[in-house]
Amino acid sequence: MTTNSSGKPAGGISWRTYLALCKLKVVGHIVFTAIIGMFLAVPGVPPLDTAFWASLGIGFAAASAAALNHFLDRHADAEMARTQNRPLPSGDIRPAQVVGFALVLGIVAMAILIAFVNMLTAFLTFLSLIGYAVIYTVYLKRATPQNIVIGGAAGAAPPVLGWCAVTGSVHPYALLLFLLIFVWTPPHFWAYAIAKRDDYAKVDIPMLPVTHGIAFTQLHILLYTILLFLAGLMPYVTGMSGEIYLAAALIFGGIFVYYAIRLKRKADPRLAMQTFAYSLVYLVGIFSALLVDHYIVL
């Protein structure tokens, strides 16, 4: 089979198009937090075969949800400058092909989790997939400016899925991990929404900066980062983690609050994007600290 320089088979669809549908950066963060959940669930090292299959299944499910999101948002994506080059608006692939790809990924994900992990993890992963791809994308995203607050539950599930994959149960500590991502999600997305407010307004998506204004959103980003700072202390307060984690939580959380204060004082799209970028650093940093603290006792 011949291919052109873009990796596209003659008369076919480029493999890069399928990768773009999967939103690999998002999937990477999801699998990362799920893996952290697996390692935190046990005193030593989790069964590596279970960790492998769980990571693969959760990753495939996340990619399936991402592809469905491409399909369901295709009309809005065609109108927004930042998304016009996505596979569907650019005409690289047909809607039916995207749906088929998403279904295959979803079926494979469920088969892996049922066969090699456990039914509870498969069930919770399926709920997360539906929560993001259907409940959030189809309804919440266009129904309320609190879309990302309510819909954030699906995005906060991965560490719970990882924990459940190893233990077969949902522990209160796993719910603390859920809480961290759940509270992190609004300031993360709202900072981005400030920078891209005009795009969202153009397609009538009621993100908070569109419906309530920039100043209102800036205030709520600050309030949520303060709440996140406090939530970030909970693993230490409850005895889940120790001093290494506490130091990281204070540093990473304090810097996030600092960014939020700067953003509150100045409505600057560049500063909003810097805050958005740091929120990703925070998430990786705080979960990495949880892992390090789990294995190193001072």
Curated annotation (Swiss-Prot):
Parts of the chain that traverse the membrane: 26-46, 52-72, 98-118, 120-140, 148-168, 174-194, 214-234, 241-261, 278-298
A single GO molecular function term of this UniProt record: protoheme IX farnesyltransferase activity
Gene3D superfamilies assigned: UbiA prenyltransferase (1.10.357.140)
Cystine pairs: none
Pathway: Porphyrin-containing compound metabolism; heme O biosynthesis; heme O from protoheme: step 1/1
Catalytic activity: heme b + (2E,6E)-farnesyl diphosphate + H2O = Fe(II)-heme o + diphosphate
Entry's Gene Ontology cellular component terms: plasma membrane
CDD domains the record matches: PT_UbiA_Cox10
Membrane topology, record value: Multi-pass membrane protein
One GO BP annotation of this record: heme O biosynthetic process
Pfam families per UniProt: UbiA
Subcellular location: Cell inner membrane
EC number from the UniProt entry: 2.5.1.141
The keyword Transmembrane helix is assigned to this record: yes
The protein's enzyme class: transferase
Entry keyword set: Cell inner membrane, Cell membrane, Heme biosynthesis, Membrane, Transferase, Transmembrane, Transmembrane helix
Superkingdom classification of source: Bacteria
PANTHER family: 4-HYDROXYBENZOATE SOLANESYLTRANSFERASE, PROTOHEME IX FARNESYLTRANSFERASE, MITOCHONDRIAL
Protein purpose: Converts heme B (protoheme IX) to heme O by substitution of the vinyl group on carbon 2 of heme B porphyrin ring with a hydroxyethyl farnesyl side group.
Alphabetized NCBIfam families for the sequence: cyoE_ctaB, PRK04375.1-2
Note: Carbon 2 of the heme B porphyrin ring is defined according to the Fischer nomenclature.
Family in the record: Belongs to the UbiA prenyltransferase family. Protoheme IX farnesyltransferase subfamily.
Official protein name in the record: Protoheme IX farnesyltransferase
Species, as recorded: Methylococcus capsulatus (strain ATCC 33009 / NCIMB 11132 / Bath)
